[in-house]
């Protein structure tokens, strides 16, 4: 059946794992996404997609590893539900499923979770999946190309404003 949760993506994961799954039948992996856009660097702190994948590793006992999937639009100036962007999401879903299957033994060995406090955050660029040259493991960077501030716009109202800034980080980070 379907369940609706009035909370964050991370809250939904914790509720699902601790209360909705039958006792003794917990998942081996928390999969979150597909998020529209990239989640990298310092902006991970704002990501519901990554937080949901992370929730199983830090808020559930015993911990469950996580896998977050993010994808840039195939055509940036078209709506998310355009034909090209829907095709991109379908291709990313198939590829991410294959990626998870290929790395299943990295997370689990003989049905036993061996990396319970691990989250993999996968970012797909806005290219056709068929043009990708493979995957590469990196570490989380600390740079962000956005600066976010909240400005008061009325007596009890604040509006987020973002501006682009130059970001530099190690070459081998996200």
Write out the residue ranges for each language-model feature.
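Sec-exported extracytoplasmic/periplasmic mature domains
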Residues: 18, 57-61, 101-108
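Second-shell loop/turn segments in exported
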Residues: 2-4, 39-44, 82-87
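Extracytoplasmic/secreted envelope proteins and their assembly/folding machinery
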Residues: 10, 14, 28, 50-53, ...
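Internal, conserved structured core segments that host functional sites
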Residues: 25-77
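Short, well-structured alpha-helical segments in soluble
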Residues: 15-25
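A cross-family phosphate/adenosyl-ligand binding-site feature
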Residues: 1-12
